């Protein structure tokens, strides 16, 4: 597995991803802070192919869906990945904070329009947030929830279990 540090703007983003690479045994590809995220993605595809990695995860900077230049940058990263690998990505996931609320729908819709999402990763389900907005996202945008984050450890990123999610969202009366 390889990780691409395409979040070249947030302070300590590369270091944070380096920690995850170390924890998981993944190979990390990155460049200097402020580098072009598309260039990092291109280098990462080449490095992953050279190493025989079967999975490449490209971490991009968080961004507001209302900032058009940042959304265009994200679309560019996707185009670079497709061109460098010769095919579309297997997955394009939006990582959505479970505390986001109704704004999450607009965010998902605009990200989906810009880069063609394949699903969602819902994080921070270990707190009090329920993540109910994903029901609307799933219903109206036809985007499945693929992963959920329930903590800070490697094993806390889990496959989505609809029954477990529904039980947490609407618990049985006691």
PLM features: residue spans?
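P-loop/Walker A NTP-binding module and the surrounding RecA-like catalytic core of P-loop NTPases
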Residues: 1-174
């Amino acid at each position: 597995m390889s990780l691409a540090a395409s979040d070249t703007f947030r302070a300590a983003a590369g270091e944070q991803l380096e920690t995850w690479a170390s924890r998981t045994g993944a190979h990390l590809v990155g460049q200097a802070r402020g580098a072009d995220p598309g260039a990092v993605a291109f280098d990462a595809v080449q490095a992953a192919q050279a190493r025989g990695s079967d999975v490449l995860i490209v971490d991009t900077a968080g961004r507001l869906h209302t900032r058009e230049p940042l959304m265009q940058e994200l679309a560019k990263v996707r185009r670079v990945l497709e061109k460098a690998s010769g095919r579309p990505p297997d997955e394009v996931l939006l990582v959505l904070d479970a505390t986001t609320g109704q704004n999450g729908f607009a965010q998902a819709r605009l990200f989906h329009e810009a880069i063609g999402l394949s699903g969602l990763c819902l994080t921070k389900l270990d707190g009090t947030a329920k993540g109910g907005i994903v029901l609307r996202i799933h219903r109206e945008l036809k985007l499945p929830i693929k992963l959920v984050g329930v903590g800070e450890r490697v094993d806390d990123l889990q496959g989505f279990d609809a029954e477990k999610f529904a039980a947490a969202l609407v618990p049985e009366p006691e």
